[in-house]
């Protein structure tokens, strides 16, 4: 099920960050989960749609689409 959130922060050098979801804990996002061609990056404050899966360290985003 797709969820909509807003990028809290994303570090291009390290390739990960977090997405804020209203009423939920922040969700970890790795650059490999971003659905785009070319350089995979997100901007702070950007709205995204994604799915949540349980990762090794808690919930993480997958199938991230920039809105």
From Swiss-Prot:
Keyword Cytoplasm assigned: yes
Location (main, coarse): cytoplasm
InterPro entries on file: Cold_shock_CspA (IPR012156), Cold_shock_domain (IPR050181), CSD (IPR011129), CSD_CS (IPR019844), CSP_DNA-bd (IPR002059), NA-bd_OB-fold (IPR012340)
UniProtKB keywords: Activator, Cytoplasm, DNA-binding, Transcription, Transcription regulation
Any one cellular-component term (Gene Ontology): cytoplasm
A GO molecular function held by the record: nucleic acid binding
Protein localization: Cytoplasm
A Pfam family per the record: CSD
GO terms classed as biological process: regulation of gene expression
Gene3D superfamilies linked: 6.20.370.130, Nucleic acid-binding proteins
Domain CSD per the UniProt entry, residue ranges: 5-64
Lineage: superkingdom: Bacteria
Subunit (UniProt): Homodimer.
Job description of the protein: Can bind to ATTGG and CCAAT motifs (Y-box motifs) of single-stranded oligonucleotides.
Name of the molecule in the record: Major cold shock protein CspA
């Amino acid at each position: 099920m797709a969820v909509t959130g807003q990028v809290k922060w994303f570090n291009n050098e390290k390739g990960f960050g977090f997405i804020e979801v209203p009423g939920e804990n922040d969700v970890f996002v790795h650059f490999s989960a971003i659905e785009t061609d070319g350089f995979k990056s997100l901007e702070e404050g950007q709205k995204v749609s994604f799915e949540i899966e349980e990762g090794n360290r808690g919930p993480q985003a997958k199938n991230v689409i920039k809105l």
